[in-house]
Amino acid sequence: MSTLKDNKVGVNYVELEGVSLLTLLEGVSSHASTDKSLPTLNAVHIESEGGLFKAKATDRYRLIEGSLLSVDGRLEPSLIPLYDIKRVIALCKDHKANRVQFSRIGDTITVSSLGDAITFTVSDGTYPPTEQLFTDSEKEPTAIDSIAFNPAFMADYAKIAGKKAAIKIYFTGAGKPMRVRITGDTIKWRALLMPMSYKD
């Protein structure tokens, strides 16, 4: 006889702490493209396997991934439009002290907590591969004379890190992405930022 837990796993179900999920999605969604003509990038990619829930987003100029421990279940890779991610964030704000559940059946995901629920359809686009970019950024840092970047992006990192927290930047070469290290209590962050062209 199958157990309730077996049934949850069978239909793609994962459960997370509301406050941690809120922090994760607020941070990751800040890096999603706001260009609705790019539906694959105007979205957040999520998945959960082996007790680890991951979310990532990119606008082509920066890339971020955050991961946290899940309470229960698994969820196959799913691309969620930014509009719907904002709805999930709103639900999490109302349930920071509670657990939040994701349940996927087919192309439909329902996010719920204590009777409140929203349902939406996942995007059908193919998310760009990102793991190799993160792997390449882990190589030995290099010394460079100077680098230009968008300061507004750094402000987003400051919000993710929290008040009085430091972030650390690693340079991997001229014209290559900078690796941004953000330390979190419950979330493990990985972030990359492309330099800008600049003429003196």
What are these regions (language model features)?
Residues 1-200:
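DNA polymerase processivity clamps
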